[in-house]
């Protein structure tokens, strides 16, 4: 598998899968399949991807206390962010939400600066500054825009943003001592562990669509996420993080935005367009800065986008 150019194949698959997933994730909920049950389907689709990962790794699993702690903590942060994301997309369209979510490196970098006393350099700080401006612009919703109103959607979006950024920070330590397949395994276990919470949050007194465009459509969409995440694992394994991190951080949201705009058949306000563009630029800069920080500290590159 480790041939020249292998990593680019994994990057392309990851970008396509995650970009399409981001744009379509809200469709089952709009068809009457609750967002909380969408989380349940997502967690279950992690199982086949994990089986593939474990087969590739010949069923070897890191099971010391540190590995279990880092793996499960990473998984819980990712799963909690995912659970909130499903609800967030009930209040705002994907073309507004995902550009903000692409800014997860802001949190990862700030945590590294605060707790590890690392320096991010001018590129990182520029990315953070642009990110703040992007969020400010994206918070503007024209009065005639019925797809999003108020500021609740921004607050909800910040929750997975912080959770996934913290996940990336934790994974800096996990990647230093664990195989990627083991991290993936514990993430799946953690995701499955939150299923009872999702079921508890579900209002079963309301009609639920159990048809083809409900849970079955959700499964088809969520499998893109699980295998897209697995492709990212191997992209980092066979390629250079300083190239892969900016590409994957920036390109997936671009594809999500394009597809989402087509689905909604809207032309966003010029201020929104500027916010989207700045968010993507910020993600590109911070992905590059984050990779350089990893290289300086001799720690493997974090897969902060591993599970989303």
Each model region followed by its residue ranges:
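Transmembrane alpha-helices of multi-pass small-molecule transport proteins
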Residues: 32-80, 162-166, 184-203, 216, ...
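Alpha-helical transmembrane segments of compact multi-pass small-molecule transporters, enriched
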Residues: 45-49, 100-114, 190-194, 247-263, ...
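Juxtamembrane helix-loop boundary signature in multi-pass membrane transporters
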Residues: 1-13, 106-162, 274-308
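Loop-to-transmembrane-helix transition segments
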Residues: 6-14, 60-84, 152-160, 207-227, ...
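Structural motif at transmembrane-helix junctions in multi-pass transporters
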Residues: 30-37, 83-100, 176-182, 231-248
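Hydrophobic/small/kink-forming positions within alpha-helical transmembrane segments
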Residues: 15, 19, 23, 51, ...
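Transmembrane alpha-helical segments that form core, pore/gating elements
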Residues: 11, 15-36, 55, 145-203, ...
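Hydrophobic/aromatic residues within transmembrane alpha-helices
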Residues: 28, 38, 88, 114-116, ...
């Amino acid at each position: 598998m480790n041939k020249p150019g292998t990593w680019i194949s994994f990057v392309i698959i990851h970008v396509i899968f995650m970009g399409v997933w981001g744009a379509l994730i809200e469709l089952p909920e709009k068809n009457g399949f609750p967002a909380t049950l969408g989380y349940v389907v997502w967690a279950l689709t992690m199982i086949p991807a994990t089986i593939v990962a474990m087969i590739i790794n010949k069923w070897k699993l890191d099971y010391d206390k540190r590995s279990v702690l880092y793996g499960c903590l990473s998984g819980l942060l990712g799963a909690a962010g995912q659970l909130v994301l499903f609800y967030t997309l009930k209040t705002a369209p994907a073309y507004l939400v995902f550009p903000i979510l692409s800014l997860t490196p802001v949190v990862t970098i700030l945590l590294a600066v605060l707790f590890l006393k690392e320096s991010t350099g001018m590129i990182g700080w520029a990315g953070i500054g642009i990110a703040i401006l992007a969020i400010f612009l994206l918070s503007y919703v024209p009065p005639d825009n019925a797809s999003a109103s108020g500021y609740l959607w921004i607050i909800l979006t910040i929750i997975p943003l912080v959770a996934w950024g913290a996940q990336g920070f934790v994974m800096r330590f996990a990647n230093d001592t664990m195989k990627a397949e083991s991290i993936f395994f514990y993430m799946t276990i953690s995701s499955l562990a939150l299923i009872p919470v999702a079921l508890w949050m579900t209002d079963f007194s309301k009609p639920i669509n159990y048809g083809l465009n409900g849970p079955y459509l959700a499964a088809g969409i969520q499998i893109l996420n699980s295998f897209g995440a697995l492709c990212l694992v191997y992209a980092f394994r066979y390629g250079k993080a300083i190239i892969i991190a900016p590409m994957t951080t920036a390109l997936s949201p671009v594809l999500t935005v394009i597809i989402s705009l087509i689905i909604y058949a809207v032309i966003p306000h010029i201020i929104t367009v500027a916010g989207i563009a700045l968010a993507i630029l910020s993600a590109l800069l911070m992905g590059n800065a984050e990779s350089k920080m990893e290289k300086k500290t001799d720690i493997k590159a974090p897969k902060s986008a591993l599970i989303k």
